[in-house]
């Protein structure tokens, strides 16, 4: 069985199943999970929905490379990345990033690294529907600053 699970899907994900898979090995001492959700407010406007597009082969390749970099840098055991695409409503879960390791420090750092690179380097395109209309979301300076520390 592989120690990496990567999925890009329209349907909601099961956090509990992903967590169980991450932490089922007896050598795991720490499991760190991040779950991102659709916010109801962005850039000062009320958000009603978010539409995510991607190119499947490109996206899966980018996610696989990001996870491989994390595994090369930290002593981690399992990684699970699930990213949703399609139409999402306010409050819906968008992304799950989970990392297990023998020690918490490795798991925390690897999880944050994966999330930072996923947010800036994975080819997802986001269109928000707000009270002001629709708009494509661009990368923020803070996202690039997060990458610079790695």
Curated annotation (Swiss-Prot):
Transmembrane segments: none annotated. CDD domains: MoaE. SUPFAM superfamilies: Molybdopterin synthase subunit MoaE. Keywords: Molybdenum cofactor biosynthesis, Transferase. InterPro entries: MoaE_sf (IPR036563), Mopterin_biosynth_MoaE (IPR003448). It is an enzyme of class 2 (transferase). The gene is moaE. This is Molybdopterin synthase catalytic subunit. GO terms for molecular function: molybdopterin synthase activity. Its EC number is 2.8.1.12. It comes from Pasteurella multocida (strain Pm70). The keyword Transferase applies. Pfam families: MoaE. PANTHER family: MOLYBDOPTERIN SYNTHASE RELATED. The keyword Glycoprotein does not apply. Belongs to the MoaE family. It catalyses: 2 [molybdopterin-synthase sulfur-carrier protein]-C-terminal-Gly-aminoethanethioate + cyclic pyranopterin phosphate + H2O = molybdopterin + 2 [molybdopterin-synthase sulfur-carrier protein]-C-terminal Gly-Gly + 2 H(+). One of its GO terms (biological process) is Mo-molybdopterin cofactor biosynthetic process.
């Amino acid at each position: 069985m592989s120690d990496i699970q990567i999925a890009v899907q329209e349907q909601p994900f099961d956090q509990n199943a992903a967590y169980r898979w991450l932490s089922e090995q007896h050598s795991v001492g720490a499991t760190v999970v991040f779950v991102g959700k659709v916010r109801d407010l962005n850039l000062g406007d009320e958000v009603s929905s978010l539409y995510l597009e991607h190119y499947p082969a490109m996206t899966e390749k980018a996610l696989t490379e990001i996870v491989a970099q994390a595994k090369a840098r930290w002593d981690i055991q399992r990684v699970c990345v699930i990213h949703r695409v399609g139409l999402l409503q306010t409050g819906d879960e968008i992304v799950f990033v989970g990392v297990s390791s023998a020690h918490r420090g490795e798991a925390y750092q690897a999880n944050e690294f994966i999330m930072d690179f996923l947010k800036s380097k994975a080819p997802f395109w986001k269109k928000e529907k707000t009270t002001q209309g629709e708009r494509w979301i661009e990368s923020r300076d803070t996202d690039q600053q997060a990458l610079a520390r790695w």
